[in-house]
Amino acid sequence: METPLEAAFYCMGIIILVPLPLLFRFLLSLCNQCCFLMTYMRLLLAILQLSLVSFVYAQDAGLERWMMEIDDRVAVSSLSIPGAHDAATGEGLHSLPGFGVTQSLDIKSLWESGVRAFDLRPAVKDTLLYIYHGRLRTTVSFSEALGIICAQLERYPSEFAIVLLREESDSENESERSLWPHLVGKAIQEIGNKAAVFSPDMKVADARGKVLFLTRNAYNGMERGALLAGWNHSKDGNANAQIISSRNGEVARLQVQDYYAPTNAKKRLEKVEAVKHYLLLASKAPEGVWTINFLSGYSTTWLGCTPLATTSGYKRNAAWLHPLVLEGMENGKHPMGIVFMDYAGVDRVDGGLWHWKPFNVYGRELVRTVIESNSVPAE
């Protein structure tokens, strides 16, 4: 959340600090005849280099606990929260390379980059619950993913997380599908009071230190999170979907956009317009109306017809869409809702198996922009 003055100091710091190690290396060469001076200069050089690294990394300091600045009385529905689509793919996949990866950071690193909403899609393999993306199994189990998030909540109790759940049933047989409600319910029960109770007008104070589960599929023992109804993948989304409290059946209106396959020029235009439209809806939504807006998608086709979820396709989508969305994010403080994206927390990624040039995806800038749109805390 840099002011112009902070940005100026940052530039001055780079200008001043970067040449200093070079200067000291030159002076060091003049001191070779004196053992004491040489040792002293080496020590000074090491300190300066460490200071430079610390200075640069300090620009992201605070993102691991950015919610500390949000007033307790603010409604969760009125926040701007960066999210990671298929968040566990950054942990690695048990599959052929080149397919299905939507993140380059693991879950812990996503948290540290400012992400607070995690799209996790458990599926049963034999009798165990792993996170999947379609038919592709990640290297992390559902319980392990929750453990990583809960560890961050222990470390940063001012924060909370939102976990968006969906059964990724493509890889499951009938027997495995029958186990899903029980295994998901059991994993959530194991985190105890860290699971937040949903209400349409819940405040930040109600959520701090907890995980809010919003699920597209019911599971056993649902008492704290909420069930989503009316989800679709059309270019228009659904501005009248519902979030239904598991505790008492209270219903909140949900505005949701998840148009995930912009595989030609017409569909790409539809995608960017849909994202911007739901950003506008979020900015005007009254308290208690929730917004989930997916920037994610893939843009690769096979022989011009069948869409394929290649890793390069997700990168390509992020590279063209994220700059357009950033241009449309007006300056000022206004709600954006929960904004799910690919390659959150990083600005540049390698091209991968299907594309040799790197992609500029602006995921770090996008996360920061979403966070910075939150209102200034009350005095």
Model-predicted segments: where are they?
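Positively charged n-region of N-terminal signal peptides that target proteins for export
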Residues: 38-43
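Long, acidic (Asp/Glu-rich), low-complexity accessory segments flanking structured domains
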Residues: 59-113, 126-156, 160, 295-379
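Cysteine-centered motifs
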Residues: 11, 31-35
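Bacterial N-terminal signal peptides
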Residues: 46-53
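Surface-exposed substrate-engagement region within the catalytic domains
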Residues: 194-333
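Positively charged N-terminal leader segments that act as targeting/secretion signals
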Residues: 1-12
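Hydrophobic faces of well-ordered beta-strands that scaffold small-molecule active sites
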Residues: 118-120, 161, 213
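Conserved, mostly hydrophobic/aromatic
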Residues: 121, 163, 339
